[in-house]
Amino acid sequence: MKEKSCGCIILKDNTVLLIGAKDDAGKLFWSFPKGYQENGETDIETAIRETKEETNLDVKIIDDESITTGHLIHGGTAYKEILLFIAKPLNGEIKIQEDEVEKAKWVKINEASKYFDGYYSDVWKKLLDRLKYLKIDAS
């Protein structure tokens, strides 16, 4: 079984927006705003909608090519594919969706990988490579 989730890696002034949520055991983990597609949505439409729902931010996708990762879920019985699109905020103040998100914060891009304990570690290499390709400074 395969599931798909789409979201945004939001960049602003050499920082990235991380959201904190709790796992089934109640432990806080860091991630990006993302969620499941609704009927008929494209991957990018899902990413923009989920970002708005979870953070109240309107975003502009700055790269149509997703950074893709994934992991096993449901006790290893399904694979969750995660497509993340690089975006920038257009307007809005962060207001978290309290039933899904515990907190949100801007973190320097070059310090953000320490928030993941191996989870999303592949995303950071892909993100830095992509930023270099797009000529976006991540220092």
Spans of features found by a protein language model:
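N-terminal strand-loop-strand
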Residues: 1-32, 59, 63
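Short low-complexity stretches enriched in small and charged residues
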Residues: 14-19, 37-44, 59-65, 127-131, ...
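Charged phosphate-binding loop/patch that engages nucleotide di/tri-phosphates or the phosphate backbone
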Residues: 114, 118-139
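Unchanged
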Residues: 37-61, 68-123
